[in-house]
Amino acid sequence: MDYREAGVDIQAGRSFVEKIRQGVESTYRREVLGGLGGFGGYFELPQGYQHPVLVSGTDGVGTKLKIAQALNQHHTIGIDLVAMCVNDVLTCGAEPLFFLDYLATGKLNPQQLSDVVQGIVEGCRLSGCALLGGETAEMPGFYPVGEYDVAGFCVGIVEKSKILDGSQVNIGDIAIGLASSGVHSNGFSLVRKIVEVNGLNWSDRPQLLNGQTLGEVLLTPTQLYVKPILNALNSGLDIHAMAHITGGGLPENLPRCLDKGQSVEIIDKSWNILPIFQWIAQQGQISPASMYETFNMGIGFVVIVPPEKAQLAVNFLENQGILAYEIGKVIEGKGEVVIESND
């Protein structure tokens, strides 16, 4: 008996690395030293920082993977993975430098996982960060056939004096919401339960979704905010804090970027609520409060700016190609999000 008979094909693993090599190396920045295949990845710190601080983040894609695997559509999952990590690192003002991935599966399917890596490559290119390395684990008996899991790791850099940690936020500051591309990568356990309980299929075309299938809309990749936000910071736009709206929605994530004694008042429906959220609420009979506590509700990232700079911020970000809305303001409070009706 050998390792291959036990379910681990080392040669297939080598072939997979060669299959993805060109794409991976296309993401390299000038600071990358060496190439793919070493025990570690080398990255030289960029020049021009007086007191550079490294910022790290790690995340996954959750049960959105179940939909991708059910539909055999894997190319957008890699973008999700990168976005979940780089958007987090971005919130303190850091520029993402490099990314690492971990892929685990029961039996290596080179085409399936190369589709995933192709998405990771695209996400890294769009974010300006290098795919510095990764691990592909073939674990027979651990995952059902055709299933896999992914995790990502990102490291960024920020000047110490420019770290956005909430201490710059003032009462009266304005919350600018940046549009999400859809559900992003959170809340999918609830979505999957709704589909199961109602006897629906990913190929269904609900009237609310304007001809698109449910699967197509749900697999829309997570929006990457890196380039527009870095451009805003580099232009000198006065940004006091930022938040990535992930699991827990606005109520869970906005308070993470505030100072003590502060809350945020959000004006309900002061932005475009995407049809997919209306569909989820209707099909699942979910209360507005629960929707806000589970999903991003059309706002994937929030920038806090002084009131006199709010319109400038909206205009600048929209010129970067992303919809931006004034969605609320910072008020005195105990680290809460207060959602006020716009009716």
Swiss-Prot record:
UniProt pathway: Purine metabolism; IMP biosynthesis via de novo pathway; 5-amino-1-(5-phospho-D-ribosyl)imidazole from N(2)-formyl-N(1)-(5-phospho-D-ribosyl)glycinamide: step 2/2
Keyword Ligase: yes
A single MF term (Gene Ontology): phosphoribosylformylglycinamidine cyclo-ligase activity
EC numbers for this chain: 6.3.3.1
Biological process annotations from GO: 'de novo' IMP biosynthetic process; adenine biosynthetic process
Keyword Nucleotide-binding: yes
Catalytic reactions on record: 2-formamido-N(1)-(5-O-phospho-beta-D-ribosyl)acetamidine + ATP = 5-amino-1-(5-phospho-beta-D-ribosyl)imidazole + ADP + phosphate + H(+)
Pfam families associated with the record: AIRS (PF00586), AIRS_C (PF02769)
Cellular component GO terms held in the UniProt record: cytosol
Record keywords, A-Z: ATP-binding, Cytoplasm, Ligase, Nucleotide-binding, Purine biosynthesis
Enzyme class at the top of the EC tree: ligase
Annotated compartments: Cytoplasm
InterPro entries given in the database record: PurM-like_C_dom (IPR010918), PurM-like_C_sf (IPR036676), PurM-like_N (IPR016188), PurM-like_N_sf (IPR036921), PurM_cligase (IPR004733)
Family: Belongs to the AIR synthase family.
Name the UniProt record assigns to this protein: Phosphoribosylformylglycinamidine cyclo-ligase
UniProt organism field: Rippkaea orientalis (strain PCC 8801 / RF-1)
Recorded name of the encoding gene: purM
